[in-house]
C-alpha cells in the first residue's frame, strides 16, 4: 500500500443494487479518491474518502470556462473471482494528454494507477459478477479556483468515482445499431480539442444526438468540420469499415479521440493477418463501396460496449444497409476476443490486463 494515500473510513455502507437493473452510471460505491492542486504547491493530499457531495464556490472556473477532463475504464470480475483492469496505463496517459491541451497540470501517472488500484481493491465487493456487468471507473479533473477571469485556473481537484454498470446490450447479445450521418453540426475542428476527453466536446454533441434519436437512430456519425465529408467518429466510439477484406479506420488527425479499444482492435486485427488502413475516408467512399458490394461490415469501438456493429447508415434520407444488416464475422470475433481478455478467460497476446 502507498502510505502517501490517506484513508478515511465511512460510517455508512450503501445497499448494493440489484445487478439485473444496474443501467449505466446510476449507482455509486461507498468511497472515492480525491487529490488537490494549488499553484506553487502542486498535487497534494491524496486520499480515499467516503463518497459525498462536493462544496465548490459558485465562481469556480469549471462552471464558467470549461476546464474539465475525464476518463472512463472498467474493472471486470473473472469466473474465479479475481478483479482485472483493462489497459489502465493507456487511460492515464490519455488523461494527461487531455490535461495538457486544457492547460491543466499533469498528474503523476504511477500515483494515479496506485490510487485507482487501491480504490478498486477497497471496493471489490461492488464489482458485479453477472454476465455483461462491470465496475465503471471515472477519473476526472476540474478547475476550482474562485475567479471569473478568463485564464487557466490556479487550483484543481482530481477525483475517481466508481459505478457498477450493466451490459450495454441489455441481454449481453450484440445488436447492430442504426447510425445517422450528421453534416450540419460538427464535433471538433483541426487545432481544437477533439483529441482531448474534455467535457465540452460531449456537451457539443448532445443536440445532434437528440436529433438522431428523434429520427429513430441510435448514434451520430460525425464528419470533418471543413468539407463535412470525411468520417471522424461515432458518438462515444471510434469507427471501422471493412472494405474488400481490409479494415479501414480514420487516422488520428487531432480532431478524433485516440480510443484505447480502437488501439486494441487494430493490434488484434493485424495479429490475425487482416490489413488495417488508418487513413482519411469520406462518407462518399463508404457509400460507393457499399454500392459495389465491397462494404461488408461497419463497427464502432469503445469502453462502454467494446464493439458495436452498425447495421444501417443514413445521410439525407439515403440509407445504406451494411452487409445483410446483421453482425459481421470480424465484429463478432473482436467482441468475443476483447471481452474474453477483459474477463480473464484468455491471457491474450499483449498482456493488457492488470489484476487488482
From Swiss-Prot:
Entry cofactors: pyridoxal 5'-phosphate
Coiled coil region boundaries: none
Record-listed N6-(pyridoxal phosphate)lysine modification sites: 197
Keyword Transferase tagged: yes
GO biological process terms on file: isoleucine biosynthetic process; L-leucine biosynthetic process; L-valine biosynthetic process
InterPro entries referenced in this protein's UniProt entry, alphabetically: Aminotrans_IV, Aminotrans_IV_CS, Aminotransferase-like, B_amino_transII, BCAT-like_C, BCAT-like_N, BCAT_family
Key words, A-Z: Amino-acid biosynthesis, Aminotransferase, Branched-chain amino acid biosynthesis, Pyridoxal phosphate, Transferase
Enzyme Commission number(s) of this protein: 2.6.1.42
Domain of life of the source: Bacteria
Class of enzymatic activity (EC top level): transferase
Residues of the signal peptide: none
Catalytic activity: L-leucine + 2-oxoglutarate = 4-methyl-2-oxopentanoate + L-glutamate; L-isoleucine + 2-oxoglutarate = (S)-3-methyl-2-oxopentanoate + L-glutamate; L-valine + 2-oxoglutarate = 3-methyl-2-oxobutanoate + L-glutamate
Transferase in keyword set: yes
Pfam families hit by this protein: Aminotran_4
Regulation affecting activity: Inhibited by canaline.
PROSITE patterns, per the entry: AA_TRANSFER_CLASS_4
Gene Ontology MF terms: L-isoleucine-2-oxoglutarate transaminase activity; L-leucine-2-oxoglutarate transaminase activity; L-valine-2-oxoglutarate transaminase activity
The protein's annotated pathway: Amino-acid biosynthesis; L-isoleucine biosynthesis; L-isoleucine from 2-oxobutanoate: step 4/4; Amino-acid biosynthesis; L-leucine biosynthesis; L-leucine from 3-methyl-2-oxobutanoate: step 4/4; Amino-acid biosynthesis; L-valine biosynthesis; L-valine from pyruvate: step 4/4
Family: Belongs to the class-IV pyridoxal-phosphate-dependent aminotransferase family.
Its biological purpose: Transaminates branched-chain amino acids and ketoglutarate. Involved in the final step of the methionine regeneration pathway, where ketomethiobutyrate (KMTB) is converted to methionine via a transamination. The amino donor preference is isoleucine, leucine, valine, phenylalanine, and tyrosine.
Database matches in NCBIfam families: ilvE_II (TIGR01123), PRK13357.1 (NF009897)
Identification of the protein by name: Branched-chain-amino-acid transaminase 1
The encoding gene: ilvE
